[in-house]
Amino acid sequence: MAVGGADLDIPAGSFCGLVGPNGSGKTTTLRMVCGLQRPDAGNAWVCGLDTWVAQMEVRRLLGVVPDPLNLFDRLTAREWLAHLGRLRAMDAGEVRRRSEELLGVMDLTDAADEQVGGYSHGMRKKTAIAAALLHRPRVLLLDEPFEGVDPVSAVAVRSILDRFRSAGGTVVFSSHAMDLVERMCDHVVVMSHGTVLAAGPLREIRGPGQSLEDTFISMVGAAPTDPSLLGWLGGDDG
């Protein structure tokens, strides 16, 4: 079972970080919320709409960066954004204006007419983030949005997400970078083995005088280490 008994209520307008070890169910949770994966039981609601009853309406409300990324490799970044604009019946001129601004902020302008299939992982991730923002959604669901993104672009992305949130948008993103979540988020969800261990405002989840990483390790447990193993790494051949 990838996820079981997950009961989450993420307030509108919040910046929520979803954290957990590899295989904890973060990606599955995001996929169920956005309608990419149907749960065996239970419901997912976005802005008061059931994801599986009002699928088209929910998709209009969401901007999603899934894992793995869902891009058309034979299209250029500029073509990909134009294609998404047509699918959403957006005004062509507005799509061009927004696309150029997004490509510029993501430092993709010089590569905008190259096929996405030739992009690095970080460039593909930035293209996906631009695509998620294009239609100005109300909620962003981002699976590891900063993975593989260079530090300069990461600062730009954080600035964009802060601006999106300050305008009333809701951001939910998964990450293994505890310091990043602690710096950006006001809410946090801690998962392990498909179960939600804690969820709520960051200030309440984080222990007194502890970092989020300290709290996370105390909840999830540190990986066991046997000092008798891997002695050869220190030059001890046994």
Where are these regions (language model features)?
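Catalytic Walker B motif of ABC-type/P-loop ATPase nucleotide-binding domains
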Residues: L140-D143
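A short, surface-exposed alpha-helical micro-motif characterized by mixed small hydrophobic
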Residues: V181-E182
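Helix-to-loop junction immediately C-terminal to a conserved catalytic motif
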Residues: C34
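ABC ATPase "signature
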Residues: A199-G200
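Conserved ABC ATPase "signature" region
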Residues: A82, R86, G93-A111
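Conserved catalytic motifs of ABC-family nucleotide-binding domains
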Residues: R136
